[in-house]
């Protein structure tokens, strides 16, 4: 079933599990005013606990993370191990509740757009079917160009409403490294998708003020445009 567009939402995906989606999402949340945050599905500890420490969230644990499984595996496999299924209707209900309470909602995915959410759907399918404007976080390292092209190709094939790409520095980089590994002009030329932010390296990802400064320097407000 295809749902109506959700103009107040942003889905944050990435090229893989270590792209830095959680940090980028937290930084965007800290600079977006009144905002709800949802980790769509989590397998193993990590992201939801980070959000609870960094963000002053006025929402229930179920709204923050409607689908949680213990084993750090792909969600359908983690659910199978517990004798459960991934119930996306439950996630949709949590998202609807957040939309009713907040003018903006950030939804973080698990892994990349090609990562499985259920036995039938990938993250890209969720974004396409729920019509979620999507940002894809690409870590600035060797291989970034190919990762960006691959993620955009999958998004287009499935029908994901792409908002743009975010280049994320996971370590201190020189200007030469940035240009060599993730040249903005070439990536935009190959993908036809704008790079809406270049997120700088954050030395202390557990310091909200550092995250705020990084988001402001990257002009992350543009991520909501479109």
PLM feature spans:
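Short glycine/proline-enriched coil/turn segments at helix->beta-strand junctions
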Residues: 31-36, 100-103, 131-132, 191-193
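C-terminal binding/interaction regions
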Residues: 184-218
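N-terminal phosphate/diphosphate-binding loop that engages ATP/GTP or pyrophosphate donors
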Residues: 3-7, 23-85, 89, 94-97
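Switch II (G3) loop of P-loop NTPases
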Residues: 91, 95-119
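Conserved catalytic-core segment of NTP-binding enzymes
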Residues: 43, 110-198
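General beta-strand structural signal in soluble alpha/beta enzymes
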Residues: 36-39, 62-65, 105-109, 136, ...
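Short, low-complexity, intrinsically disordered N-terminal peptides in bacterial proteins
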Residues: 1-10, 209-226
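Glycine-rich phosphate-binding P-loop
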Residues: 11-25
């Amino acid at each position: 079933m295809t749902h109506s567009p959700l103009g107040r939402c942003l889905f944050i995906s990435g090229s893989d599990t270590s792209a830095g989606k959680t940090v980028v999402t937290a930084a965007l949340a800290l600079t977006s005013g009144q905002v709800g945050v949802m980790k769509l599905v989590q397998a193993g500890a990590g992201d939801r606990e980070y959000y609870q420490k960094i963000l002053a969230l006025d929402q229930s644990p179920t709204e923050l993370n409607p689908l949680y499984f213990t084993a750090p595996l792909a969600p359908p496999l983690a659910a199978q191990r517990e004798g459960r299924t991934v119930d996306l209707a439950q996630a949709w209900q949590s998202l609807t509740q957040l939309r009713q309470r907040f003018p903006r909602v950030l939804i973080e995915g698990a892994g990349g757009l090609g990562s499985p959410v259920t036995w039938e759907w990938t993250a890209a399918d969720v974004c396409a079917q729920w019509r979620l404007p999507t940002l894809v976080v690409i870590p600035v390292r060797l291989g970034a160009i190919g990762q960006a092209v691959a993620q955009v190709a999958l998004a287009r094939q499935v029908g994901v409403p792409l908002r743009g790409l975010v280049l994320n520095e996971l370590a201190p980089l020189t200007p030469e490294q940035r240009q060599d590994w993730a040249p903005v002009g070439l990536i935009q030329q190959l993908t036809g998708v704008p790079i809406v932010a270049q997120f700088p390296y954050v030395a202390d990802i557990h310091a909200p003020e550092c995250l705020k400064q990084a988001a402001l320097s990257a002009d992350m407000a543009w991520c909501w445009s479109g």
